[in-house]
Amino acid sequence: MNGLMKANALRSVIAAAAVCAAGAATAEAASPAAPAKSAEERGAWFREARFGMFIHWGVYSIPAMGEWAYAQKPWKPGEYEAFAAKFNPTRYNPREWARLAKAAGMKYAVLTSRHHDGFCMFDSHFTDYKITKSPYGRDAVREFVDAFRAEGLKVGFYHSLPDWTHPGYADKESPEFIQRGELHVPTPEQYAAFKELVFNHVRQLMTEYGKIDLLFLDYTSKYKADEDYFDRERILSMVYACQPDILVNDRLSYWKDNCRDFDYYTPEICVPNQPQKVKGRPVMWETCATINDNWGFAKDDNNWKTPEAIVAGLVGCVSRDGNLLLNVGPNELGEIPAPAVERLKAVADWFKTNGESVTGCGKSDFRPPFGCAYTQKGSVVYCHFLQPPLGDTILPGLKGKVERITLLRTGEEVGQDNVWGFELLLPDEQRIRTRGLRAGDVLKMELKKQ
């Protein structure tokens, strides 16, 4: 590096540090910062990972009605906020959570630092409505970061841009509007104070917890949904200055096409039918989904997804070049519910023998047979059976192209029949012996060198 290049690099570092460390006025004056690396460069680990753990946890675990508990009933003044004085998750063991996630094949985890109810799971410098003022008294976010990093997982924060408890925020999905049809409209001073709180909270999370790999911002408001309600350029400039390698999702605007700058797209509780594009360009994407029907702990929600459904959802995402962020909702004591643990352990059993068909894989250009999905890594195509086959399986477009087929569950080689005689095969179709296979089985198909 010559002297001029060194000087320019140093100026860039100093400028980024100034935006990151400075107060509101400095950051607001700065022009929007673009990270030095592209989203694709920063997201190499994300595309390799394919599977992550989402964790929705807060004081809403006490009423145990899900993460929107604050909006689900007409609480008396101060009634919901009083849960903070009872919040004491003495069984919170994030190292156990991390080991559970790692065994299930998850490579990263995202924790709610604050949800829409405004309660901070970290030691906020800007409000006393936080976990360090509860009987627990410790920073749950810091403990999460330390534990998951120690197990070798990437870490990220979910952070709610809305705060239903702040007078500066207006929302047609707020408790007041849902329960009484009333829309609180803040004064300009209240709105300015609210935006400052959002900015300061995000900056604290970006500066006091070491390297953060992912930021999942969330926005629910349908009030002025088409406007830049949160000063997104200001927030993005600060975030990228503080964390140059971070990935930021698409929810700084209610509608994804309004948010000019984002690194990955986040469909919710669904698997898209194809690799995703936004404004004509391919984007990294991640489906977030619940392991039952609620994000936060809900004592009456027993609609748990089966391990087979979880695996099928994961495969569906990877086969379309996407990720799955699977959510668990710990209870008020800090425990992941036993049914969720059981299912993740079952997924871990599947992953022990089949993990290579997910990690580092993406879509395949070959068309999968009936009841199957394909993932691919280099010259290896993985055939995932989403249901037990009726008998043998016909592979479209692969006749004469496969060197070897192995059942990952057993390591046994699968035979390829070129002639059967009782059906009409197209010239490019290959019949293989799959009688006795079951849902969740994966065939490793090594293609011949061309």
Located regions from the model:
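Bacterial N-terminal signal peptides that target proteins for export
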Residues: 2-14
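Bacterial N-terminal signal peptides
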Residues: 11-23
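Sec/Tat signal peptide C-region and signal peptidase I cleavage site
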Residues: 25-28
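Mature catalytic domains of secreted/periplasmic carbohydrate-active enzymes
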Residues: 30-450
